Structure formats: structure tokens, C-alpha cells
């Protein structure tokens, strides 16, 4: 891990801790932007579940729209927006390649989830058409009956993605739009640079 990458990761960690201890209602919420095989972009909000020097992890159904995007076009952009921090909020952007986390990691995280969340992962066919809420409720009841009295295993089609950073951008909001921006970026040889940007 290069010094500048370590610096960017430490900066994120400090800001994330600050957001967790602030009035932010959901500090771990992040927008994940992907593109499908035709290059059509889409974005949605998910929760950050882990991060370290290897990257930033979230979990989902692998056959969901984002899951399919990331398996056919393994690049993503993340966006954290913490409006309550500092003078006028802080925004962090992270861009990078994407890889599946190991089955062991996915198993461990799935086992830590509330039981009803585990059941929901089995009952939901994420991103597919649903005829009615009653249909979903019936699917939930069926899964509950299937696993009654025993642990709920992780579905084969559910797992984690790790975004491996190739760029970080830190935006510190200020009055009169006189913001401060810093960008850390890796080149093709994985050499990191740091520069300040006009707001």
C-alpha cells in the first residue's frame, strides 16, 4: 500500500468516524453507480458494510440489476454525502474496479444479519417484477416455514462486492460555494498522485 493510498484511506476513515458520531441519520449510506453491458448508467443507495486496504464492501443479490451490471462491467463509483459535517457538508467519491468477495466473507456477514433479513434474502427475487405485496408476503411465509427451527443459510445467488479504489475525491463544503477539493488517483502502473482541484 503506497503512502498516498494509505493517506486517502485514513482520511476516509476519519471522516466516516466523524459522520457516525454526528447527526447523520445513516452514515454508511452510499450511492453506487454502475453501467450495464450497453453502457447505460444507473445508481442506487446501499449500505457500506466493511472497508479496509483491500476496498469497500457491500452485499446484494448477484442477479439484481446492479449485480448483473457489476459482473458484466466490473467498475463502479461510490458517493458518500454527509450534509451535517463541518461548515457545509462533506462529500467523498470513490471510483474503482469491482470484485466478488470470498464465499467465506459472504457467509460470515450473512450469518450476522437479523433472521428476518436472512429470510428476506431468500424470498426476494430482487429487481424482478412482483405482482403484489401479498405475493411477496406469501414467499416470506414459505421461506419461514422451510427454515423453521434451524439456521438460515446464505442463498447461492447472494453475496458481496468489493470496490477496489483507483481514485478518491474529498469535497469539503464552504460558504459562498468556495469549496475545497482534493483528488487522489492511481495511474495505469498503480502509482498514486494527489492534487487540489478548483471547486
UniProtKB/Swiss-Prot annotation:
Its EC number is 1.4.3.5. GO terms for biological process: pyridoxine biosynthetic process. The keyword tRNA processing does not apply. Pathway: Cofactor metabolism; pyridoxal 5'-phosphate salvage; pyridoxal 5'-phosphate from pyridoxamine 5'-phosphate: step 1/1; Cofactor metabolism; pyridoxal 5'-phosphate salvage; pyridoxal 5'-phosphate from pyridoxine 5'-phosphate: step 1/1. The keyword Phosphoprotein does not apply. It catalyses: pyridoxamine 5'-phosphate + O2 + H2O = pyridoxal 5'-phosphate + H2O2 + NH4(+); pyridoxine 5'-phosphate + O2 = pyridoxal 5'-phosphate + H2O2. Catalyzes the oxidation of either pyridoxine 5'-phosphate (PNP) or pyridoxamine 5'-phosphate (PMP) into pyridoxal 5'-phosphate (PLP). This is Pyridoxine/pyridoxamine 5'-phosphate oxidase. It comes from Xanthomonas euvesicatoria pv. vesicatoria (strain 85-10). The lineage of its organism: Bacteria, Pseudomonadati, Pseudomonadota, Gammaproteobacteria, Lysobacterales.
Amino acid at each position: 500500500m503506497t503512502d498516498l493510498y494509505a493517506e486517502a484511506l485514513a482520511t476516509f476513515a476519519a471522516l466516516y468516524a466523524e459522520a457516525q458520531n454526528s447527526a447523520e441519520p445513516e452514515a454508511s449510506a452510499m450511492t453506487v453507480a454502475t453501467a450495464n453491458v450497453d453502457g447505460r448508467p444507473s445508481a442506487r443507495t446501499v449500505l457500506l458494510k466493511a472497508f479496509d486496504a483491500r476496498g469497500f464492501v457491500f452485499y446484494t443479490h448477484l442477479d439484481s440489476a446492479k449485480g448483473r451490471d457489476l459482473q458484466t462491467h466490473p467498475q463502479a463509483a461510490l458517493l458518500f454525502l454527509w450534509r451535517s459535517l463541518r461548515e457545509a457538508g462533506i462529500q467523498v467519491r470513490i471510483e474503482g474496479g469491482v470484485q466478488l468477495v470470498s464465499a467465506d466473507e459472504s457467509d460470515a456477514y450473512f450469518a450476522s444479519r437479523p433472521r428476518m433479513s436472512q429470510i428476506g434474502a431468500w424470498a426476494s427475487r430482487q429487481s424482478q417484477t412482483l405482482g403484489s405485496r401479498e405475493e411477496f408476503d406469501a414467499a416470506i411465509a414459505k421461506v419461514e416455514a422451510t427454515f423453521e427451527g434451524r439456521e438460515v443459510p446464505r442463498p447461492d445467488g447472494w453475496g458481496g462486492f468489493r470496490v477496489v479504489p483507483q481514485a478518491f475525491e474529498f469535497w469539503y463544503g464552504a460558504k459562498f460555494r468556495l469549496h475545497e477539493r482534493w483528488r487522489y488517483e492511481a495511474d495505469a502502473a498503480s502509482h498514486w498522485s494527489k492534487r487540489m482541484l478548483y471547486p
